[in-house]
């Protein structure tokens, strides 16, 4: 009482009510649990329970080894790449007999393959006794122009002799798929290594013999991105 006037007193936050107090208790409990978990995790890290892996040895822990495209291609070239090309190879004259001037329309015929993102199909082909009519070793992408036995049409058939473009070999292999690689970089590196293999193991040994008038036997792949040109990347190349 103060001067005869009654004064009421309430505890702090009492106006929130019982429900409000309970909600605050739950919130505080959650915060406490979160804090405890953070402290525990920090303690685990500081006690040496996490294995430290040296740079370059991450694969020992993750199981994913460093990708080496050169080793990968070397391991499959003689045992898988060449055998598949030789098995699927179609004589260029057979292709020209049916699709001369409309090579982009072949699709899956002749075991044509392409990647999901690609617009054009790739094919394994062969030639025997094809005469070299022109040699270009000066251009950035060197080629020899070949005369296909029995063919008199306008389609130009060439064989790459370095440097090399396109990915027809990689993309025509049934056992190589983009999903098998970690990223686009590795996918591209495999193609680069394949073209390096072509240079060292296929073209270089016969490079000096590539001259007008010589005849060649070859097995290789090409991408049908033109209706009147076949540019072959060889996996087997013999010069006579």
Predicted regions and their residues:
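OB-fold and OB-like single-stranded nucleic-acid-recognition modules
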Residues: 32, 49-240
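Sec-dependent bacterial lipoprotein signal peptides
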Residues: 4-9, 13-47
